[in-house]
């Protein structure tokens, strides 16, 4: 049913491609703004803790 609604509505491939590119761009932006800084912070804390325990 959804297949018929999607292609019966006249949605072009260009619109679907633009939407997919936008979604991928959003994922990359989220990774750059949220995941990378959080991972960097956690690695920094982990390394700092390991150095303090080694003393």
Swiss-Prot record:
PSII consists of a core antenna complex that captures photons, and an electron transfer chain that converts photonic excitation into a charge separation. PSII forms dimeric complexes. It is a single-pass membrane protein. GO terms for biological process: photosynthesis. Its main location: membrane. InterPro entries: PSII_PsbX, PSII_PsbX_type_2_subfam. The gene is psbX. The chain crosses the membrane at residues 24-44. Pfam families: PsbX. It comes from the Bacteria. The lineage of its organism: Bacteria, Bacillati, Cyanobacteriota, Cyanophyceae, Synechococcales. It is found in: Cellular thylakoid membrane. It comes from Prochlorococcus marinus (strain SARG / CCMP1375 / SS120). Involved in the binding and/or turnover of quinones at the Q(B) site of Photosystem II. Keywords: Membrane, Photosynthesis, Photosystem II, Thylakoid, Transmembrane, Transmembrane helix. This is Photosystem II reaction center X protein. HAMAP family: PSII_PsbX_2.
């Amino acid at each position: 049913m959804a297949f018929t609604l999607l292609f019966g509505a006249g949605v072009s491939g260009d619109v679907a491609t633009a939407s997919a590119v936008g979604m991928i761009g959003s994922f990359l932006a989220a990774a750059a703004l949220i995941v990378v800084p959080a991972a960097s912070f956690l690695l920094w804390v982990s390394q700092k803790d390991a150095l303090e325990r080694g003393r």
